[in-house]
């Protein structure tokens, strides 16, 4: 690791001791500096942690944006005197974006807590979206019933017609029995079931995130044209609000479709492919126009649009870090009443989350679509989220 800019002439890092050392002839000049920038290839976590903790107290700004292959900050005690931390443009796996966005104080606390104790994080967010009355809540109930009782949970009558989701309903779910997972790797999902009425759409962005998986639910009984229209409407919304999210399209009411199922499935899959192609072409045309203008603001906007163009972006570590909405696989058809397709859907969701592939789940593999899965988090972070989950579960049970 080296120090770039003028600091390289004043500061030396003795890698054999992993400590910062001052040259006697430059010691006074170093004391007058407040900004330090580290650059080069990211060292092993233990080495980087030692470097971070050894930064002299008079420095106020730490710039790590020049370090390549940096995917995580190690557990460490950042100097209390630092008031600014500049990171690479590629989002880190640790701390997560929700911590980084709150600034240096939150990052310092997170790394300190991580140093004092951590455990692997096997929880992910599942967003269930779609038109009202498409069967989103019944689908969530059916998947949870299958996880607990298997095929004996069906037939299932579903929710009453007047039992509609108001705003968003949140519930925790372990999709597979504990014995189906490797020791210590029980995948758990926090399910956000979003109300589909138009009046709730404006508030969805408050609870949505682009590092989650979205189930886009469509009602197959509406016919090909209406099913495709509703799906495109929600794909556009997801592209706007969560451009990096992974989307799986699920068709409900399979038992009510009769012989039209095959035609509907083919129509939906063709519409998805056409939607992805059209959105990419539209955004690329806009990008070219903005870049051709030469205006600074337009160039910045072009850079933002490139991130949403729909092309998957991969960082130096081979992990997916951005891009537009990623529709994985083809339409999956289920019946919440008979249970047909529910078990396959649950296993499909787990496979995609755990491996990024539509194959049998193996949680010991390295996930690409959800790279934070299995990474260590502080015990304090896990304890807080577990307490919140317990409170939500208790509230749901009381309401039931």
Question: Where do the model's predicted regions map?
Answer:
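Short, flexible boundary segments at extreme N-termini or domain junctions of P-loop NTPases and their
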Residues: 80-127, 131, 180-181
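Noncatalytic alpha-helical scaffolds and linker/capping helices
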Residues: 340-400
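Switch I (effector-binding) loop of TRAFAC-class P-loop GTPase G-domains
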Residues: 146-184, 198-200
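Conserved G1/Walker A P-loop phosphate-binding module
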Residues: 112-160, 187
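Concave beta-strand-loop units of leucine-rich repeat
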Residues: 1-6, 12-18, 35-43, 64-69, ...
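Canonical P-loop GTPase G-domain recognition
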Residues: 98, 102, 108, 256-363
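A structural signal for leucine-rich repeat
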Residues: 2-30, 47-56, 73-80, 96-103
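Conserved Switch II/interswitch segment of TRAFAC-class P-loop GTPases
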Residues: 211-232, 242, 254-261
